[in-house]
Structures are given as C-alpha cells and as structure tokens.
Amino acid sequence: MPFLQFLTGEDEPVSDVKLGIHGFVEYIPGNTNLVISVPHGGEMRPPFMDDRDKKPKTTRNTVVPPPGADVKNANVNKDDESLVLITESLEDDTHSKISVVADIFTQEIAKILVKEYEECTGRRPHVVMDHLHRCKMDPNRPIQYAALGDKLAEGVFKNYHNFISEAKKNIDGPGLLIDLHGQNHHQNSIEIGYLYTRGMLNQEDYSLVTPSVSSLLRRHQLQPADILHGDESLGGMMEEAGYRSCPSPRQPSPGEDKYYKGGYITQTHGSSSGGEVDAIQLELPSELRHERGPEVRERFARDLARVLVRFMQKYYACDNSNVISVSETGSTT
C-alpha cells in the first residue's frame, strides 16, 4: 500500500505524493517542521539494476527501462559489463563500507509513527522513503558508494536527497530530520546519533566534531552534554517512556558496546555545516522492530511519535498542547 494511502485510509491515489524515478523514492509533503527519512527499508530489487558488491567500482553499465515500465517484473537483457575495481585503500573512510542489509520493518514503524503524530497534533511530518532494496542503492552513503557507478542508482540517490532538501525548504524556521534505521547489536538499545563517535562519547570530548544539532544548541544556549544525555535529551525522553537508549542519562556513552554515530544523511542534512534544520539518526534494535512481534513494534512506534512530539514542543517551538502524555501509554522495554 502506498504510504500516503495508508495514512489517509483512502482508496484513491492522493495527489500530493511525489515520486522519483520509477517510483523508487516517495516523498509525502507534510505541514510541520519534522521530517522522517527511511532510507533502508525498501524491498524492490529490479533485475535491470546491478547489485551493489562488497567493493566499490569506478564504472558500471546499467540498462535503464523506459518510463512506465513494470519495474518489479521487468525482464531486461543486460549488456556485458566491464568492471574496474578501485585499488586504493578505503579502510579509513567510514562512508566507504558497503552494506546490503536492509533495515526491516523501519517503513512499517514510520507509517505508524507519522499517523500517530498527526492524530496527536493535527500536523503531519514530511516523509522521504526509499523503496529500493539496499542491495541496489544506499542513500546513506556518498554517491560513489551509494550507487557504485550505476547511472540509474545515481539518479535515484539524487531523488532521495533532493526530496529531503525540498522538505527542508518547506520548513519555516527551525526543524528536525529524524533518520530511521535498524541494527542488531546485542545490547538492544536505541542508538541516537549526533555525529559524535563512540570514542568521543566515552571520553566526553565534544570538541572534535560539529554535531548535527548545532542549530538546537545555539538557539537554546545548551552544552553538548545537555542534549546528549541530559534529562530533557531525546535519550532521556526515550528512557522515561521505557526504552533503553544511548546516549541518555542512564547510559551517557556506549562503553564497549557497538554504536552508530550517524551517517551520510545526518551529516549532509543536519546543521553541522549551517542552517536551522537539525538531524538525528535513530538506530532501532531488532527486538523493537521484529523479534518481539507486531504488537511491541506498533506500541513502540506510537510511543516514539509521542516522544518526538514532546521533543519538538521543547526545542522547536511547536504548539501541540493537545498531545496525550507519553506516560499514558504505560510502555516498558
């Protein structure tokens, strides 16, 4: 079911949805200053696009189908390819790592989250969603690693980031981008990424990077520690709602646990390089996405929506006084 049709419950297509090339990327404009990005939940694997391999390549040929082609069932004979491997070391480039693992159920969580947010506030977040499987294109990497030379994948990549830029332009004043992901780390905590590495958080050294919430820090005259693990940090609010999170007052740093600091989307579209729109990456553990079943997933998505409402009220001048308290959900995780 198309995302906007899910939100409205209407059988007829809704006119304000915007689609990229062959419908691989979907943008549903909202009417508030929150953007939800879901880059790794797609399932489409069109056979006319090459899979992303474990090593980046300098060039790759792709047969691009005509507009209107059945991209799900297309049967296209591809030309022989000549692939050239990059030989220089990429070990120090964190963006160069090639992963093709999908973040399952992140789209489903986003649907419930957005619907709950709108029901609570009367305002709908902007949504940008990639329907391609990550084995075809990864919006959370620089284009050379996202597409590996595939021209169609490069076009889809540009669609994704252009839609985020369009959503940001539609925000008047400060705003927030939430980039939704999934991870399978053993600690089963929600990992909240502001671009600080695990080492920086462990050492409480916040001077080595400009965070993706720099606008928030400037506007409210806060120190990084306040927004990372203060009582009214996003991690603090998630913990109060019953969900283990890092960083948070309970766990201000990851220690030896694995931790994702925020990727290309957070770096590119947050306020680390200026602007009023911040970005935060949320890495959701497998137990909340699928291991404990659909009821836990749905409850979590609703609770996350209410936490975001509270966070937006606190830091982004949102008047959502009719919102139901997160504590009324009674969630524990």
What positions do the PLM features span?
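N-terminal catalytic or cofactor-binding beta/alpha core of small enzyme domains
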Residues: 1-333
